[in-house]
């Protein structure tokens, strides 16, 4: 698939189904470019049998994986999140050399609220359940900074175009929602791992383990722009 000046695979670079998440698979029919040059990433019921894991995967999800090996710069999408229960859309990147490291610009968890609303007393303004995160290695073990939600206004992300971006330099990683800085990472041990590699950019729709496999949501994650500004 060619989109926004880049070539994209319509599945993860290692395959079409994750052996630890076999209820859904990366379905090429669930990712397409519409007449307005927008990327559409679906979730829909589309069973397919995979002999390697001896299981029929019930739900087809849209995922695109960019073939470019990216280094420092700003990575940005403008998107409307999918609407439905137990969805797991994401804009993220991971190393071409190993996993981790991984940078999650956001992972969205709709849970039982189809528009990703989640009120928490301890964080009354981070009420859209979209989380930044960063995975790394320490003492041979996979670790993460921890998922965090952030305030980016009262606009429903399933009804409004929101800009999600990350700026990656050798000295810091900054996350922005609608051009507002929401998180900054400066830990040297983490940056050293990132700075030694190149990153694979991925945009995907998805579902969580709690999804209804009998009647899964028919959802659409629409992305109208992807921009990379190298440094």
Region roles according to the model:
Residues 1-231:
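GH16 jelly-roll
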